[in-house]
Amino acid sequence: MDRLVKTEFNEVNLNFQKNQKCSSSFKLTNLMHTMSVAVSLTTTNPTTFSINKPLSVIPPLSSSTYTLHLTNLNQPPLSEPADVITVRTSMLPTGKATTDDLRRLFNKPGPHVFRDAVITVILVGPTVAEYVISNYETRNLFTKAISVCTKSNLTNLMKPAVESGKVEYVTDLITAGGDVNFRDSNGKSLIPFAIRTGKLAVLKLLVANGCRINDSVDFVLHEAAIIDRVDVVKFLFESFCDELDVNSVNREMMTPIHVSASEGHVSLIEFFVSIGGNANAVDSRRWTPLHHAASRNHLKAVEFLLENSDVKYARELNGKTAFEIASESGHTRLFGVLRWGDALLQAARVDDVHALKKCLGEGAEVNRKDQNGWTPLHWASFKGRIKSVKVLLEHGAEVDSVDDAGYTPLHCAAEAGHLQVALVLIAHGGCQTNLKSFQHVSPIATFQKHVSLHYSTKKSETFA
């Protein structure tokens, strides 16, 4: 005979409750027609699990019910592999035995003891499911845990599953009956929580199963701005185009561009601006996106916003410009673009060498361009400010920098008739003579009758 008893099931489900005594029952049946069977039940984790009748006797063709108890715990005692109950049996011709008799019987190894069954202990319920979401990647544990959950349990598990970014768990909950249109105590849908994970697959799964948003609460574009995901933003517009506004504001009156600027996410700022986002918008503190980028020392964001907004000198509620905000925080690398750049251009225009050197010493970018692509060297050359030209060149100014129309500083000097400036530029390598914007007319042609320039040009060619 292979075994003396049979189990009702190969698994026993134990619905775990945090910090409570938990129990579950299972049944064994004696297969012997005329003889009683002694039964020994042991668990792989006796400090956690106990059985009400670890040693017992089952009469012929009878059944006995046993109860598995779990001690008070604040988290489910999951293990891989799972804990089990081992069922050992032995024939008992006398039909009766004391506990000590049974203990001696099973303590003595031999062919009289059968290993009839192994019953797997399965921890189930919403508490177990939530614990698995946070701590395990094992889908089998999760599907078993939710097998006894109510629809309400399943729906409440949707948020932690979405927050985990584990698309398989979200799929299992939806399949089992979880409501994708769950809303938390603040009225938020599952969409913002999916966005925060950065898992586009979870987001697509929710949308495909009918999850809707209320953007007056969800602020999905703001959420996407935080994680710097243009692909997520594009998907949101594809899915909820009639419900989204690129200039929508959150409770602080910040637009998605404000948030992107605060995080320094230039690619998203560019995208939002490209679809109509207002780079000049102000929030509840009258901060522009430029104020936010400056406060967080995001140079690339500051540079982009300076080129795509008109708020360089805008003042917030306390009267501070973006430069003053950056200055208070000690973000010295922003000083050049937010302030010294303008001062540098002005100094170059008026030939204020002292101011020029001060700006450069404070960190102004020597090749910083204005709205027309003119560098300080363009301005100094055009104005004939030879002292400024020399200082700028000494500090690394690009002699052949090209503006938006294709002009170099040498072109500017030539058009304005500043011979000495042109000579200085040529001496520093400024000899671009064939730019398309001039229809192949060299700026040197402007001075071709000037003997000193002609000699200088020939001399440079001779020693080249």
UniProtKB/Swiss-Prot annotation:
* Bilayer topology: Peripheral membrane protein
Under the cellular component aspect of Gene Ontology, which terms does the record hold?
cytoplasm; nucleus; plasma membrane
**Coiled-coil annotated spans:** none
Each ANK repeat, start to end: 153-182, 186-215, 217-246, 252-281, 285-314, 318-347, 349-368, 372-401, 405-435
Q: Does the keyword Protein transport apply?
A: no
Tissue expression summary: Expressed in roots.
**Where, per UniProt, does this protein localize?**
Cytoplasm; Nucleus; Cell membrane
| Keyword terms, alphabetized | ANK repeat, Cell membrane, Cytoplasm, Membrane, Nucleus, Repeat
InterPro entries noted in UniProt: Ankyrin_rpt, Ankyrin_rpt-contain_sf, Ig-like_fold, MSP_dom, PapD-like_sf
Q: Domain MSP: where?
A: 3-124
Q: Which Gene3D superfamilies match?
A: Ankyrin repeat-containing domain (1.25.40.20), Immunoglobulins (2.60.40.10)
Q: Does the keyword Membrane apply?
A: yes
Where on the tree of life does the source sit, at the highest rank? Answer: Eukaryota
Q: Name one Pfam family in it.
A: Ank_2
SUPFAM superfamilies noted in UniProt: Ankyrin repeat (SSF48403), PapD-like (SSF49354)
Function, as annotated: May be involved in arbuscular mycorrhizal (AM) symbiosis with AM fungi and in nitrogen-fixing rhizobial bacteria symbiosis leading to the formation of root nodules.
* Protein's name according to its UniProt entry: Protein VAPYRIN-LIKE
Q: Which organism is it from?
A: Medicago truncatula (Barrel medic)
